[in-house]
Curated annotation (Swiss-Prot):
NCBIfam families: PRK04968.1 (NF003439). It is a peripheral membrane protein. This is Protein Syd. The gene is syd. It comes from Escherichia coli O157:H7. The keyword Cell membrane applies. It is found in: Cell inner membrane. Its main location: membrane. Pfam families: Syd.
Length: 181
């Protein structure tokens, strides 16, 4: 596990939860995750769940993705998706508004790995350098990804070679995020 990335993710999650507490006097609330089982759920309303991060349980790697492509995945990606269970968190990096993707449960972790594999299949078919997404943007064809060759974080337009460098590594990217509520 990459300790710098794990700590940066935990620190951002704490900043996000603290901002939510300050604004709403509660743990984060999600309507999107209502009805989806998770160890993160503290309580449920009639159409939403309150959640708090929980330690990840299970194997702390995305080896299924590695096996599917017979490649080595950046250690930061293993760490990013297996440090904790949490809800997705809205954030800002510079002037970019994003939703930082998180693993909600063990079932969700399997789905995340399947989505990462699908993403890599498309990139391989289009002969694009491999990236692994970590966040979504309002523009549906853009994501924030980690380049699997360099470990750099970039904004990428799906299905194209268009990439904008954002940070030299995932820990630095996470450390620069500001919570958005």
């Amino acid at each position: 596990m990459d300790d710098l990335t794990a700590q940066a993710l935990k620190d951002f999650t704490a900043r996000y939860c603290d901002a939510w507490h300050e604004e709403h006097k509660s743990w984060p609330l999600s309507e999107e995750l209502y009805g989806v089982p998770s160890p993160c759920i503290i309580s449920t309303t009639e159409d939403a769940v309150y959640w708090q991060p929980q330690p990840f349980t299970g194997e702390q790697n995305v080896n299924a993705v590695e096996r599917a492509f017979d490649i080595v995945i950046q250690p930061t990606i293993h760490t990013f998706y297996t440090t904790q269970f949490a809800g997705d968190m809205h954030a800002q990096f510079g002037d970019i508004k994003l939703t930082l993707l998180q693993t909600w449960s063990e079932d969700d972790f399997r789905r995340v790995q399947e989505n990462l594999i699908g993403h890599l299949v498309t990139q391989k078919r289009l002969k694009l350098p491999p990236t692994l997404f970590i966040a979504t943007l309002e523009e549906e064809l853009e994501v924030i990804s980690v380049c699997n060759l360099s470990g750099e974080v970039c904004k990428e337009t799906l299905g194209t070679r268009k990439r904008t460098h954002l940070a030299p590594n995932l820990a630095e990217f996470l450390n620069q995020l500001k919570p958005l509520l």
